[in-house]
Amino acid sequence: LVNAPEYHSWTLTKLLSRLEDIPDPLRTSVRNNGGGVYSHDLYFDLMAPPGQEIAPAILEYYDTGRQFFSDMKTAALGQFGSGCAWLVISPDGSPAVMALPNQDNPLTLGFYPVLPLDVWEHAYYLKYHNLRSSYIDNWFHIINWEAVSDRLLSFFLP
């Protein structure tokens, strides 16, 4: 964006939410690089020491925490190669779980990102090798559920 000063005042969220307004030569770079920065910032911001209970706000939409964990794990394991599984708020205001490849970000599709689960190999390979499933199971124990709940609820506040 060095040579596109008209976008210098745009936030990363705005850039990703309005990719269609960015000319083709820049769009792919913004999607890939911006998507990666956004996803990883959120991923690390939503981690905490083990021990927190699942966010009560999630339980308003899922019968049990177990169902939410299952949906996220299924999406993460179903992502071939690199990418993220996401808890999102869909454009109609309902929560959903989705998987997106590479650096693709829910903002580009009109969804509000709540919680990313990074399934790029760099997220788990040193400790878990090819055991993505074990990484996912343990990941659920280091989520800052209070922050996730705040993100989820902030979507619905004016």
What spans do the regions from the language model cover?
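Feature for soluble, non-membrane regions of globular proteins
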Residues: L1-P158
